[in-house]
């Protein structure tokens, strides 16, 4: 069972439809016990970083997500949800994030239209489980005005938008997509299927303990 975190700022409907399409068992929840009982977690998000962190704090979900991230349970952040995984953001004001990944969220300063909206090429950097069946140079769908300034060793996908935008990051059990896999057609569905596979592998490992 995958828990989609519902905190009032997520693109939950489209994520829910995508999981339904790939045949994944899921629950939409903000209940701490349901999140802990899940086999994997998706943190979606659309909106401002400081407001999102305030809401997560109010719902006591910061602690929950940090515990999930520091365990081996698979966690996938999408768009703002990915940005929240980092140490802090410069959006509107300096604001601390979940600190599960090293790096800072900074505003895009490029000679192009902001937000970065639409399809862009994703160049793979290294191999991870979520790349199974995903061709290098596939196009994915973005909507964002901020990007992660983070160490190269956690960057597994890059798009060019005047700067090198980390499109996909990963460290251990933690994954983050700056783009929207649920809106990225067959390629996005394949990535979500791969995440489902990672979740199932983790679940099986727990049953054997």
From Swiss-Prot:
InterPro entries: Class_I_gatase-like, GATASE, Imidazole-glycPsynth_HisH. One of its GO terms (cellular component) is cytoplasm. Its EC number is 4.3.2.10, 3.5.1.2. Pathway: Amino-acid biosynthesis; L-histidine biosynthesis; L-histidine from 5-phospho-alpha-D-ribose 1-diphosphate: step 5/9. Gene3D superfamilies: 3.40.50.880. GO terms for molecular function: glutaminase activity; imidazoleglycerol-phosphate synthase activity; lyase activity. It holds the Pfam family GATase. Its main location: cytoplasm. GO terms for biological process: L-histidine biosynthetic process. It is found in: Cytoplasm. The active site is at 79 (nucleophile), 180, 182. It catalyses: 5-[(5-phospho-1-deoxy-D-ribulos-1-ylimino)methylamino]-1-(5-phospho-beta-D-ribosyl)imidazole-4-carboxamide + L-glutamine = D-erythro-1-(imidazol-4-yl)glycerol 3-phosphate + 5-amino-1-(5-phospho-beta-D-ribosyl)imidazole-4-carboxamide + L-glutamate + H(+); L-glutamine + H2O = L-glutamate + NH4(+). It comes from the Bacteria. Keywords: Amino-acid biosynthesis, Cytoplasm, Glutamine amidotransferase, Histidine biosynthesis, Hydrolase, Lyase. Residues 1-205 form the Glutamine amidotransferase type-1 domain. IGPS catalyzes the conversion of PRFAR and glutamine to IGP, AICAR and glutamate. The HisH subunit catalyzes the hydrolysis of glutamine to glutamate and ammonia as part of the synthesis of IGP and AICAR. The resulting ammonia molecule is channeled to the active site of HisF. This is Imidazole glycerol phosphate synthase subunit HisH. It comes from Bacillus anthracis. The lineage of its organism: Bacteria, Bacillati, Bacillota, Bacilli, Bacillales.
